Amino acid sequence: ASKKTKGRIMKTQTKPLDIRDFLHTKEAIVEYINEAYHDDDPRMFLIALGNAVRSKGVSKVAQETGLGRESLYKIFSGSASPKWDTLKKLLDNLGIEIYMRTKSA
């Protein structure tokens, strides 16, 4: 973005949006991951889960869950597919539980 000041154009410095800056509460993380789950692109769920884990700290989550840090990076980069027990450990660590309900018509 830029604006004019006495005939000169001054550029405004901006930084890229980092969603992790907004994932400080369990409620925010749940809402974010839930929206990603309902996205048409199934990769969005893992991207959102990865952002939530990164907001807490990958090393910390790896230590608390017993999962390898490198394995987590592979999952979140899309180069590895996680097993259900891995997803469950990550969600549990973030304080999130999944429940099922019938679809509304």
Feature map (PLM): residue ranges:
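N-terminal flexible/basic segments that precede or flank functional cores
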Residues: A1-N51
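Recognition helices and adjacent regulatory flanks at domain boundaries
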Residues: L23, H38, V58, M100-T102
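Recognition helix of helix-turn-helix/homeodomain-like DNA-binding domains
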Residues: G66-P82
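DNA major-groove recognition helix of helix-turn-helix/homeodomain DNA-binding modules
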Residues: K83-R101
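Alpha-solenoid HEAT/Armadillo repeat architecture
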Residues: H38, R54, S77-A80
